[in-house]
Amino acid sequence: EGEFGNFCAGGDIRFFYNAAISGDRDLDTFFTEEYKLNHLIFNYPKPYIAFMDGIVMGGGMGISQGASLRVVTERSKVAMPETNIGLFPDVGGGYFLPKCPGFIGEYLGLTGKVLTGQQALAANLADFAINSDGLANLWAILESKTETAQDKLEKCVQTIRLGSLKKDEGWIDTEIHSTFENEELSTIMRILEKSESDWAKKTYLMLSKRSPLM
Protein backbone atom coordinates (compact mmCIF):
# COMPACT_ATOMS: atom_id res chain seq x y z
CA GLU A 1 0.00 0.00 0.00
CA GLY A 2 1.34 3.39 -0.96
CA GLU A 3 -0.03 6.62 0.46
CA PHE A 4 -3.83 6.33 0.30
CA GLY A 5 -4.91 7.09 -3.26
CA ASN A 6 -1.49 6.30 -4.76
CA PHE A 7 -0.38 2.67 -5.05
CA CYS A 8 2.24 2.51 -7.82
CA ALA A 9 2.30 4.03 -11.31
CA GLY A 10 5.21 1.90 -12.48
CA GLY A 11 8.72 2.78 -13.62
CA ASP A 12 10.28 6.15 -14.36
CA ILE A 13 10.05 6.30 -18.16
CA ARG A 14 12.37 9.31 -18.39
CA PHE A 15 15.05 7.38 -16.49
CA PHE A 16 14.62 4.39 -18.81
CA TYR A 17 14.99 6.60 -21.88
CA ASN A 18 18.02 8.53 -20.64
CA ALA A 19 19.72 5.36 -19.39
CA ALA A 20 19.17 3.61 -22.72
CA ILE A 21 20.54 6.57 -24.70
CA SER A 22 23.61 6.95 -22.48
CA GLY A 23 24.29 3.23 -22.12
CA ASP A 24 23.84 3.39 -18.35
CA ARG A 25 24.19 -0.14 -16.95
CA ASP A 26 21.89 0.84 -14.07
CA LEU A 27 19.07 0.11 -16.52
CA ASP A 28 20.01 -3.58 -16.61
CA THR A 29 20.36 -3.62 -12.84
CA PHE A 30 16.93 -2.03 -12.41
CA PHE A 31 15.09 -4.59 -14.54
CA THR A 32 17.00 -7.50 -12.99
CA GLU A 33 16.08 -6.38 -9.48
CA GLU A 34 12.49 -5.59 -10.47
CA TYR A 35 11.88 -9.02 -11.99
CA LYS A 36 13.55 -10.70 -9.00
CA LEU A 37 11.14 -8.82 -6.73
CA ASN A 38 8.14 -9.85 -8.84
CA HIS A 39 9.26 -13.48 -8.72
CA LEU A 40 9.70 -13.28 -4.95
CA ILE A 41 6.20 -11.85 -4.48
CA PHE A 42 4.55 -14.50 -6.67
CA ASN A 43 6.29 -17.22 -4.66
CA TYR A 44 6.20 -15.62 -1.20
CA PRO A 45 5.15 -18.17 1.45
CA LYS A 46 3.50 -15.70 3.83
CA PRO A 47 0.18 -13.85 3.29
CA TYR A 48 0.76 -10.79 1.11
CA ILE A 49 -2.07 -8.26 0.76
CA ALA A 50 -2.05 -5.61 -1.97
CA PHE A 51 -4.30 -2.62 -1.28
CA MET A 52 -4.52 -1.41 -4.88
CA ASP A 53 -5.90 2.04 -4.11
CA GLY A 54 -5.44 4.74 -6.77
CA ILE A 55 -3.12 4.28 -9.75
CA VAL A 56 -1.99 0.67 -10.26
CA MET A 57 -0.16 0.46 -13.57
CA GLY A 58 2.81 -1.36 -15.07
CA GLY A 59 5.20 -2.03 -12.21
CA GLY A 60 2.31 -1.51 -9.82
CA MET A 61 0.63 -4.53 -11.36
CA GLY A 62 3.86 -6.49 -11.06
CA ILE A 63 3.97 -6.05 -7.28
CA SER A 64 0.24 -6.61 -6.75
CA GLN A 65 -0.84 -9.49 -8.99
CA GLY A 66 1.18 -12.05 -7.05
CA ALA A 67 -0.51 -11.09 -3.78
CA SER A 68 -2.52 -13.54 -1.70
CA LEU A 69 -5.28 -10.93 -1.60
CA ARG A 70 -5.77 -8.11 -4.13
CA VAL A 71 -8.06 -5.33 -2.94
CA VAL A 72 -9.17 -2.44 -5.17
CA THR A 73 -11.29 0.63 -4.42
CA GLU A 74 -13.51 3.09 -6.27
CA ARG A 75 -10.37 5.19 -6.83
CA SER A 76 -8.38 2.41 -8.49
CA LYS A 77 -7.07 2.88 -12.03
CA VAL A 78 -5.71 -0.47 -13.16
CA ALA A 79 -3.78 -0.99 -16.40
CA MET A 80 -0.83 -2.44 -18.26
CA PRO A 81 -0.22 0.63 -20.47
CA GLU A 82 3.12 -0.30 -22.04
CA THR A 83 1.88 -0.26 -25.65
CA ASN A 84 1.23 3.47 -25.22
CA ILE A 85 4.98 3.98 -25.56
CA GLY A 86 5.59 1.23 -28.11
CA LEU A 87 6.57 -1.48 -25.63
CA PHE A 88 4.85 -4.65 -24.42
CA PRO A 89 3.34 -5.66 -21.05
CA ASP A 90 6.17 -6.88 -18.83
CA VAL A 91 6.65 -7.43 -15.04
CA GLY A 92 4.64 -10.64 -15.25
CA GLY A 93 1.96 -9.41 -17.64
CA GLY A 94 2.56 -12.42 -19.86
CA TYR A 95 1.64 -14.58 -16.86
CA PHE A 96 -1.34 -12.86 -15.23
CA LEU A 97 -3.10 -11.33 -18.26
CA PRO A 98 -3.80 -14.78 -19.79
CA LYS A 99 -5.60 -15.62 -16.54
CA CYS A 100 -8.29 -13.06 -17.37
CA PRO A 101 -11.59 -14.56 -18.64
CA GLY A 102 -11.70 -15.43 -22.32
CA PHE A 103 -9.55 -13.08 -24.38
CA ILE A 104 -9.83 -10.06 -22.10
CA GLY A 105 -6.13 -10.35 -21.25
CA GLU A 106 -5.13 -10.05 -24.90
CA TYR A 107 -7.41 -7.03 -25.25
CA LEU A 108 -6.00 -5.31 -22.16
CA GLY A 109 -2.41 -6.10 -23.06
CA LEU A 110 -2.69 -4.67 -26.58
CA THR A 111 -4.84 -1.62 -25.84
CA GLY A 112 -3.53 -0.65 -22.41
CA LYS A 113 -7.11 0.14 -21.40
CA VAL A 114 -7.46 1.61 -17.90
CA LEU A 115 -9.97 -0.20 -15.67
CA THR A 116 -11.80 0.95 -12.58
CA GLY A 117 -11.55 -1.20 -9.47
CA GLN A 118 -14.85 -2.95 -10.09
CA GLN A 119 -13.96 -3.50 -13.74
CA ALA A 120 -10.65 -5.04 -12.66
CA LEU A 121 -12.66 -7.36 -10.43
CA ALA A 122 -14.55 -8.60 -13.50
CA ALA A 123 -11.23 -9.19 -15.27
CA ASN A 124 -9.89 -11.35 -12.41
CA LEU A 125 -7.21 -8.75 -11.72
CA ALA A 126 -8.54 -8.18 -8.19
CA ASP A 127 -10.19 -10.33 -5.53
CA PHE A 128 -12.31 -7.73 -3.74
CA ALA A 129 -13.46 -4.15 -4.32
CA ILE A 130 -14.25 -1.90 -1.34
CA ASN A 131 -14.86 1.77 -0.64
CA SER A 132 -11.60 3.58 0.06
CA ASP A 133 -12.96 5.06 3.28
CA GLY A 134 -12.66 1.57 4.79
CA LEU A 135 -8.89 1.29 4.24
CA ALA A 136 -7.87 3.01 7.47
CA ASN A 137 -9.91 0.50 9.48
CA LEU A 138 -8.25 -2.42 7.70
CA TRP A 139 -4.82 -1.02 8.47
CA ALA A 140 -5.80 -0.59 12.11
CA ILE A 141 -6.82 -4.26 12.24
CA LEU A 142 -3.53 -5.40 10.73
CA GLU A 143 -1.47 -3.16 13.04
CA SER A 144 -3.13 -4.48 16.21
CA LYS A 145 -0.65 -5.77 18.78
CA THR A 146 -3.19 -7.73 20.81
CA GLU A 147 -4.06 -10.41 18.24
CA THR A 148 -2.13 -13.13 16.44
CA ALA A 149 -1.17 -12.67 12.80
CA GLN A 150 -3.69 -15.34 11.77
CA ASP A 151 -6.50 -13.71 13.75
CA LYS A 152 -5.72 -10.31 12.26
CA LEU A 153 -5.68 -11.73 8.75
CA GLU A 154 -9.00 -13.52 9.21
CA LYS A 155 -10.61 -10.40 10.71
CA CYS A 156 -9.27 -8.30 7.84
CA VAL A 157 -10.67 -10.67 5.21
CA GLN A 158 -14.02 -10.86 7.00
CA THR A 159 -14.24 -7.06 7.11
CA ILE A 160 -13.39 -6.84 3.42
CA ARG A 161 -16.07 -9.39 2.54
CA LEU A 162 -18.73 -7.47 4.48
CA GLY A 163 -17.96 -4.23 2.65
CA SER A 164 -17.24 -5.66 -0.78
CA LEU A 165 -18.59 -4.03 -3.94
CA LYS A 166 -19.94 -5.88 -6.98
CA LYS A 167 -17.90 -6.38 -10.12
CA ASP A 168 -18.65 -4.27 -13.19
CA GLU A 169 -18.94 -6.33 -16.38
CA GLY A 170 -20.63 -3.61 -18.42
CA TRP A 171 -17.40 -2.70 -20.23
CA ILE A 172 -16.83 -6.22 -21.60
CA ASP A 173 -18.13 -5.97 -25.16
CA THR A 174 -19.16 -9.23 -26.81
CA GLU A 175 -16.77 -8.47 -29.68
CA ILE A 176 -13.71 -8.62 -27.42
CA HIS A 177 -13.54 -12.41 -27.44
CA SER A 178 -14.39 -12.96 -31.11
CA THR A 179 -11.85 -10.32 -32.16
CA PHE A 180 -8.93 -10.91 -29.81
CA GLU A 181 -9.05 -14.70 -30.06
CA ASN A 182 -7.04 -14.29 -33.26
CA GLU A 183 -3.29 -14.77 -32.88
CA GLU A 184 -2.25 -12.40 -35.67
CA LEU A 185 -2.36 -8.67 -34.97
CA SER A 186 -3.00 -8.01 -38.64
CA THR A 187 -6.15 -10.15 -38.43
CA ILE A 188 -7.37 -8.32 -35.34
CA MET A 189 -6.84 -4.95 -37.01
CA ARG A 190 -8.60 -6.11 -40.18
CA ILE A 191 -11.63 -7.34 -38.22
CA LEU A 192 -11.85 -4.09 -36.27
CA GLU A 193 -11.49 -1.98 -39.41
CA LYS A 194 -14.35 -3.80 -41.16
CA SER A 195 -16.73 -3.76 -38.19
CA GLU A 196 -19.44 -1.09 -38.02
CA SER A 197 -19.79 -1.11 -34.21
CA ASP A 198 -18.78 1.89 -32.12
CA TRP A 199 -16.65 -0.36 -29.91
CA ALA A 200 -14.70 -1.69 -32.89
CA LYS A 201 -14.13 1.80 -34.31
CA LYS A 202 -12.85 3.10 -30.96
CA THR A 203 -10.64 0.06 -30.45
CA TYR A 204 -9.21 0.32 -33.96
CA LEU A 205 -8.26 3.95 -33.42
CA MET A 206 -6.82 3.08 -30.01
CA LEU A 207 -4.61 0.32 -31.40
CA SER A 208 -3.52 2.50 -34.32
CA LYS A 209 -1.87 4.83 -31.80
CA ARG A 210 -0.14 2.09 -29.82
CA SER A 211 2.91 -0.04 -30.59
CA PRO A 212 4.30 0.46 -34.14
CA LEU A 213 4.05 -3.33 -34.52
CA MET A 214 0.31 -2.77 -34.94
Where are these regions (language model features)?
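A structural preference for short, pocket-lining loop segments at secondary-structure junctions
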Residues: 1-21, 40-51, 73-76
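Terminal peptide-recognition signature
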Residues: 12, 47, 64, 120, ...
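A short acidic, glycine-rich active-site loop
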Residues: 20-30
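Glycine-rich beta-to-alpha active-site loop
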Residues: 41-85, 108, 112, 117
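Gly/Pro- and small hydrophobic-enriched strand-loop and loop-to-helix capping segments
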Residues: 67-90, 124-138
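Hydrophobic, secondary-structure "cap" segments at the distal end of domains
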Residues: 94-103
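Basic (Lys/Arg-enriched) interaction patch that binds polyanionic ligands
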Residues: 106, 110, 114, 118-132
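Amphipathic alpha-helical blocks and their helix-capping loop/short-beta junctions
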Residues: 125-213
